[in-house]
Every structure is written in structure tokens, then in C-alpha cells.
Amino acid sequence: MENKTEVVVAENANNQTQPERKKFDRKPNRRPQGPKQFQKDDFEEKVVTIRRVTKVTKGGRHFRFAAVVVVGDKKGQVGLGTGKANEVPEAIKKAVKEAKKNLIRVPLRGTTVPHEVIGHFGAGQVLIKPAKPGTGVIAGGPARAVIELAGIADVYAKSLGRNNPINMIRATIDGLSSMHTAKKVNDLRFGKPVIKTEKPKVEETK
């Protein structure tokens, strides 16, 4: 009995000397999942062109890479960005960051655009026309990337000027940014409703 009591007393003494460990709940330390975190994931990106540029200095030639990227959420938002860096991935990263700063809102009418428009930039001109459902995107080159990432599923697009990729993209974005909603097009076409006012009656003098 004496041995048992000594063991129990010793265990109690050890438990009293050891400090209590605090249990920390790690859940509050997690970052709140807000809409800003998912906003970046909603955007898709397409690399249009990557070219090597040369800068001649007194020390010699310096080679860098220039990337042109289009981003969009396929819900009416699209943007263009360019970036330069010594490595291709870094140039693409800079272009994507710039494209997200240059987003524009494109008014959609179902799966197509509200009306016909011609976008201009430099020597580039792009004609954009609405199409019936099921037509698809009839466009080529860089303009197709912009239209698809904007969320337009049925449309006609044709280049009327130079086929420089950057000029075509900027001309397409210029055309999409000048689009009006269906209601505004209706107001511009037929005019605002006219409110009829009755003329005041004038009593005839005998």
C-alpha cells in the first residue's frame, strides 16, 4: 500500500509541475474566402503572341521577350495586356496582370452582340456583326480570342484593315467597348417616347 500511495503522489506532483498546454484553434487563422479570391480564378487567359525584342546599348545587345495576352471571364468582361521580361513566363505574368487592369464590360444580347459595329485602332479595322444562335464564332486570328473570352458564342467578325495582331486585338476591343445595350439601341433608333401635351383652350370672343 505504501508503494502505491507514493506512486500516486509522484504522478500528481508531475502533473502539477507541467504547464497546461493551450489548444489553439487554427480555423480563425484561415484567410476568409471572399469574392476577391475567386475573381482571379474566374478569368481565363490566352497568349496571342510571344516575340523576342532586342535592345542595342553600348555594352552590346540585350534580348528580352514581349508577350501579348488576352484575359476574360466569358461573362462580358475582357481585357488586353502586354509584358516584357528576360524570361517568357515572367513576360506572360506581367501581361496577365496588365490585362486584368484593362478590363472592359461588353453588353451581350443572349449569345451574341446587340448590333453591328466597326472597331478602329491604327491601321486595323474589325467588323463585328450579330449572328443567330448556333452560328458559332466566325472569326479568325487574334479577334477570335477576344470574342471567345468575352463570352460571345455567335458572331461574325472580319478584318477590314491590316492584320497586325496587336492592332486587330485593340480594334476588336474598341468595337466591343462601343457596343450599346439593346434598350439604348432601341432608344437611339426610334428616339425617346414623345409625351403629348394638350394645347390650352382659348375662349372665343364674340
Curated annotation (Swiss-Prot):
Domain S5 DRBM: start-end pairs: 43-106
GO biological process entries: translation
Keyword Ubl conjugation carried by entry: no
PROSITE patterns documented for this protein: RIBOSOMAL_S5, S5_DSRBD
Gene3D superfamilies per UniProt: 3.30.160.20, 3.30.230.10
GO molecular function terms listed in the Swiss-Prot or TrEMBL record: rRNA binding; structural constituent of ribosome
The entry's keywords: Ribonucleoprotein, Ribosomal protein, RNA-binding, rRNA-binding
Ranges for region Disordered: 1-42
Gene Ontology cellular component list: small ribosomal subunit
Domain of life (superkingdom): Bacteria
RNA-binding as UniProt keyword: yes
Comment block on domains: The N-terminal domain interacts with the head of the 30S subunit; the C-terminal domain interacts with the body and contacts protein S4. The interaction surface between S4 and S5 is involved in control of translational fidelity.
Family classification: Belongs to the universal ribosomal protein uS5 family.
Reported function: With S4 and S12 plays an important role in translational accuracy.
Complexes and interactors: Part of the 30S ribosomal subunit. Contacts proteins S4 and S8.
Protein name listed in UniProt: Small ribosomal subunit protein uS5
Organism: Mesoplasma florum (strain ATCC 33453 / NBRC 100688 / NCTC 11704 / L1) (Acholeplasma florum)
